[in-house]
Amino acid sequence: FSTVPGSYTPYPGMHMQFLSGPAVSVQGAWFATPYWGFGGRMSCTNLRVKVNGVAQNDNLECASMYAGPYFSHPFSMRWLVGAKLLGGCEIYKPCRTDFRRLERRAGFSFGTGLSTTYLATQNLGVRFSTDYDVAPPVVRSSRERLHKLTFGMEVCAVF
């Protein structure tokens, strides 16, 4: 699931709070060495919205594509620790609120993440991850970037 801590003020008098919601992502990396690789992540997130303390009927839907370096280090026969540093694009679909409609928006974003992977078999793992993304403002006139925190558990192929 994904969450956006804090509150944001895209327009004067409009205080927005984004509540946790589901996130789905696909990611992969090619490792040129056992430790360093290059890869990417595509994700979709659906965040519930409150404006001035009132829950809204519409949700903020986001899609993103990132690419960058990945790092992996085995610390036992079955456990790996990993990290990544990514840059890319975040896209917001239009979102209706009681206060004002938020238009479609896209912009540069960057993120990082940490993970631990347990190798259940030689080629199958279970990964626990935490990602932190800095996404563009929800409106063009705002300078407040969204700070997204995503916690995940994944089944992954390791080869």
Which residues does each PLM region occupy?
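Short glycine/proline- and aromatic-enriched beta-strand/turn motifs that initiate or cap beta-hairpins
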Residues: F1-P34, F38, M42-N46, G87-C95, ...
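Detector for outer-membrane/organellar transmembrane beta-barrel domains
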Residues: T3, T45, Q56-N57, A63-Y66, ...
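Extracellular loop and loop/strand-boundary signature of outer-membrane beta-barrel proteins
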Residues: T9-M14, V51-D58, C95-L102, P137-R143
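Residues that define the transmembrane beta-barrel architecture of outer-membrane proteins
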Residues: F18-V24, N59-M65, W79, R104-F110, ...
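Membrane-embedded beta-strand positions of outer-membrane beta-barrel proteins
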Residues: V26-G28, F38-G40, A67-P69, A83-L85, ...
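Residue-level signature of outer-membrane beta-barrel architecture
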Residues: W30, F71-H73, T116-Y118, V134, ...
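Repeated loop/turn-to-beta-strand initiation elements of outer-membrane beta-barrel proteins
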Residues: P34-G40, M77-V81, Y118-V126
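A generic hydrophobic-segment detector
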Residues: D98-R143
